[in-house]
A protein has these predicted regions:
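Conserved alpha-helical substructure of the radical SAM core
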Residues: 3-136, 224
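Radical SAM enzyme [4Fe-4S]-AdoMet core and its adjacent flexible, acidic
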Residues: 1, 57, 131-132, 136-142, ...
C-alpha cells in the first residue's frame, strides 16, 4: 500500500515551513533566563536536585556580578522586554537584597519572577516584592500535609505554602503557578489534590517527577519516585 503523493503546493509549503523552522532553531531567541541566586535554603527537602541547605558552604553570587553579566552578555544581544528573568535557588527569600535585585532588573527593562517554597512569604514581603517589580511567582506544593511535610522535612511547610498560595491567587497583578513534584504516595491522590487546589482558587498547576540528582539521588528518596520520572504536565 502506497501513500498519496503530495501536490506541488503542499510540497512547497512544507519546504517553506521547514526552512522557517530551521531559521528559528538557529536564531534560538532567549525568552527566559534563570538566575540561581543562592544555594542557601530554609528547608532541607529530600528531593532537592541542588542539595541546598541552610549553610551550603558556597557564597551567594553578588548582585553586582549578576548585573554585570546581564549588562555585558545578555542585554547587548536581546531586547529586555522580550526576556523574563526568574530568580531561583535554594530559597530566594533568604537573600536580603532580593528587592534591590528586582528594582535593578526592572530599571533595565526586564520583567522578573521567582520560585519559592513559600515558608518565608507573607503579605508584607509579597507587597515589598511587588513594589520592586515582581511579575510572576511559582510556589512549590508537593501534596497533602503528610506527603508535603515528609518531603520538605518541616512540620509547618504545608501550612506556610498553602498560606502563600492563598496570597498569590488573590493578587490580580501576578502571573503564577503551583508546582508539584510527584512522589509515589501522591500518585493515586493527584485527582483529589487537584480538587483541593481548585477549591483554593488555583488556576495554574504544573506537575513533574524529579530524576535522581543532588539529594534526590539518595536511596530513601528514590523509593518514593514513581515510574515516568521527568515527565512534566501543566493544567491550566
Amino acid at each position: 500500500m502506497t501513500g498519496r503523493k503530495l501536490g506541488l503546493r503542499k510540497r512547497i509549503g512544507l519546504r517553506l515551513f521547514s526552512d522557517l523552522y530551521a531559521e528559528k532553531i538557529a536564531e534560538h531567541k532567549l525568552r527566559t533566563l534563570f538566575w540561581e541566586c543562592t544555594l542557601r535554603c530554609n528547608l532541607a527537602c529530600r528531593h532537592c536536585g541542588s542539595d541546598c541547605r541552610v549553610d551550603p558552604g558556597v557564597p551567594d553570587m553578588p548582585l553586582a556580578d549578576f548585573l554585570k553579566v546581564l549588562d555585558e552578555e545578555v542585554t547587548p544581544h536581546n531586547r529586555p522586554e522580550d526576556v523574563l528573568l526568574i530568580f531561583s535557588g535554594g530559597e530566594v527569600l533568604v537573600r536580603s537584597d532580593l528587592e534591590e535585585a528586582g528594582r535593578e532588573v526592572t530599571r533595565r527593562g526586564y520583567a522578573w519572577g521567582m520560585v519559592t517554597n513559600g515558608l518565608a512569604l507573607d503579605a508584607d514581603r509579597l507587597r515589598s516584592l511587588m513594589d520592586a517589580g515582581l511579575r510572576s511567582i511559582s510556589i512549590s506544593f508537593d501534596g497533602f500535609e503528610d506527603a508535603h511535610n515528609y518531603i520538605r522535612r518541616n512540620p509547618r511547610s504545608f501550612e506556610k505554602a498553602l498560606d502563600a498560595i492563598r496570597l498569590i491567587v488573590r493578587e490580580p497583578r501576578l502571573t503564577y503557578d503551583v508546582i508539584t513534584c510527584v512522589t509515589s504516595p501522591m500518585v493515586a491522590r493527584l485527582e483529589e489534590f487537584k480538587e483541593l487546589l481548585i477549591a483554593e482558587g488555583v488556576k495554574y498547576w504544573r506537575i513533574f517527577c524529579r530524576p535522581g540528582q543532588g539529594r534526590s539521588d539518595a536511596r530513601g528518596y528514590r523509593r518514593t519516585v514513581p515510574r515516568g520520572a521527568g515527565v512534566h504536565k501543566a493544567y491550566p
